[in-house]
């Protein structure tokens, strides 16, 4: 930044830059909204996990719960299985 930059008039934002900024806000909002929901692949993953477990142990599908917890830096896949005695 030079001393002459202080004397130059500030340019008004162009319509393209305004549109870009608005689009970035919309995309960020949609990503945030989508991250709060469960992922699309979770039901299929749950069924595949149940199928693998059933190869070794007879279980009911109601005994398996799969959750995804999203935090700021990472996502955690939580799998709880109630095993028969």
Swiss-Prot record:
Domain of life: Bacteria
Keyword Calcium: no
Coiled coil: none
InterPro entries: MinE, MinE_sf
Pfam families per UniProt: MinE
Keyword presence, Cell cycle: yes
Gene Ontology BP terms: cell division; regulation of division septum assembly
Keyword annotations from UniProtKB, A to Z: Cell cycle, Cell division
Functional description taken from the UniProt entry: Prevents the cell division inhibition by proteins MinC and MinD at internal division sites while permitting inhibition at polar sites. This ensures cell division at the proper site by restricting the formation of a division septum at the midpoint of the long axis of the cell.
Similarity comment: family membership: Belongs to the MinE family.
Name assigned to this protein: Cell division topological specificity factor
């Amino acid at each position: 930044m030079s001393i002459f930059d202080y004397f130059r008039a500030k340019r008004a934002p162009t319509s393209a830059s305004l549109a870009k900024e608005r689009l970035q806000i919309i995309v960020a909002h949609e990503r945030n909204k989508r991250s709060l929901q469960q992922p699309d692949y979770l039901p299929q993953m749950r069924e595949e996990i149940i199928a693998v477990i059933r190869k070794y142990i007879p279980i009911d599908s109601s005994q398996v719960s799969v959750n995804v917890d999203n935090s700021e830096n990472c996502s955690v896949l939580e799998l709880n299985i109630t095993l028969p005695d």
